[in-house]
Regions:
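Compositionally biased, non-globular sequence tracts
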Residues: 28-29
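Conserved NAD+-utilizing ADP-ribose enzyme module
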Residues: 1-24, 47-55, 63-185
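Short aromatic-glycine-(Arg/Gly/Cys) micro-motifs in beta-strand/loop hairpins
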Residues: 34-50
Length: 185
């Protein structure tokens, strides 16, 4: 279901990338309170219109992301910036379902684009919650971005965001990181 509406979906974005995001992949959003989650529900920031317009809504490609990487690249930096934040868990869905959300004219509403974070450093890092891992290269190859596939009018934006929110809901209860991501380092 990759399409011309999302040209970046058609090629991997870095040599070290595991490849383009496939329809069968699981896509996860890490939920930090109060940013993405508050009062047992998603906040408006969870599916930020601004980030979606800029193609900067960060998500994880589950099959290409470890628990270590989630803590190191996503959770710990957020908690360090603001110790009042709290890890809630993970909301996840299948990529093809994200790509299937359409506008009132039948056009795709969202793109899911491979966007690995590649850096080099072989230090050992404490990643929190009693987990220690050896992120040898500290690469976060399972990082991806979501974006709107096109310019949408305000009503279509609201409808698309609402549909995306419903898709990521899993009985209104987030999963734990340990239940979703593999342990391997």
């Amino acid at each position: 279901m990759q399409s011309a509406a999302c040209p970046k979906e058609l090629t991997k974005q870095h040599d070290k990338s595991p490849g383009v995001v496939c329809n069968e992949e699981n896509i996860a959003l890490i939920l930090i309170e109060p940013d993405q989650w508050h009062d047992n529900d998603f906040t408006n920031l969870a599916f930020s219109k601004t980030r979606l317009k800029k193609g900067q809504l960060s998500v994880c490609r589950v099959e290409h992301t470890t628990q270590c990487e989630v803590y190191y690249f996503v959770v710990n930096p957020q908690l360090k910036k603001n110790p009042g934040r709290k890890l809630i868990g993970v909301a996840a869905t299948v990529c093809k379902d994200i790509r299937a959300i359409s506008t009132s004219t039948g056009e795709r509403a969202f793109c899911v684009i491979d966007d690995p974070i590649v850096c080099n450093d072989d230090e050992r890092h404490e990643v929190g919650i009693g987990v220690q891992c050896d992120c040898i290269t500290k690469d976060y190859l399972g990082h991806a971005h979501m974006s709107f596939s096109q310019s949408l009018n305000p009503n279509e934006v609201a409808a698309a965001q609402s549909n995306l929110k419903e898709l990521f809901r899993s009985d209104k209860k987030p999963f734990s990181i340990e239940d979703v991501f593999p342990v391997w380092v």
